[in-house]
Design a protein with these regions (language model features):
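Secreted/extracellular ectodomain signature
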Residues: 1-196
Length: 196
């Protein structure tokens, strides 16, 4: 690449990891982002999954917004999706079905497509922070395909109710198994952002 980095700095994973909400923790999700990006010539960036993790007895909470660098972020076509963290978590970001494409520049199915897979795993509140309290909305901090649920966003910004327009915090899944994620319109996909 002659010293220049690839333009892609944001994508939706083209495939999940196939085990529901068990992504191998944050490290496993990050590795999946890195692997997918590398396969498409964007491995020259350091990639992080946009996922929050709740606090445990031994670890503080991890906020998705604090894991992904400071922007700007462009999709595989070179279109700006967000200039910075504040822009990303405002109504001014450009995350839509047309821009929230996979690392292969494929459109990710949304409402009206078969199958609809617009539920994108985040475990996050609208401001990109982890949920507090006793309820698990991170599938055991992304290590379980059994217990808990996952908070998801809608990459196409469509669905029923006002929160359905949220790209990162639309509703919780019905469970953490692959089947449970599919039942509400998901496939275990998540967002990946380049931190550099």
């Amino acid at each position: 690449m002659g010293g220049s980095k690839s333009v892609t700095r944001f994508f939706v994973t083209s495939v999940g990891m196939g085990n529901g909400g068990n992504l191998g923790g944050l490290a496993g999700a990050d590795a999946h982002c890195q692997s997918l990006a590398s396969a498409e010539g964007a491995g020259d960036h350091t990639w992080r999954a946009y996922l929050s993790a709740r606090a445990t007895e031994s670890e503080p909470a991890t906020n998705a917004r604090d894991r992904i660098g400071s922007g700007p972020w462009y999709n595989a076509e070179g279109l700006l999706v967000a200039a910075n963290i504040e822009n990303l978590h405002s109504s001014e970001n450009r995350i839509r079905k047309e821009t929230a494409v996979s690392e292969r520049f494929d459109v990710v199915n949304g409402v009206g497509d078969v199958p609809n897979v617009h539920d994108i795993l985040t475990g996050s509140r609208p401001d990109g922070t982890a949920f507090t309290g006793s309820g698990d909305l991170t599938c055991g901090n992304w290590t379980s395909s059994n217990d808990g649920r996952a908070q998801v966003g809608h990459h196409d910004r469509m669905g029923q109710g006002e929160s359905a327009n949220s790209w990162n915090s639309a509703h919780p899944s019905s469970g953490c198994s692959q089947q449970a994620l599919q039942s509400t319109g998901g496939a275990g996909l998540f967002y990946c952002f380049a931190i550099d």
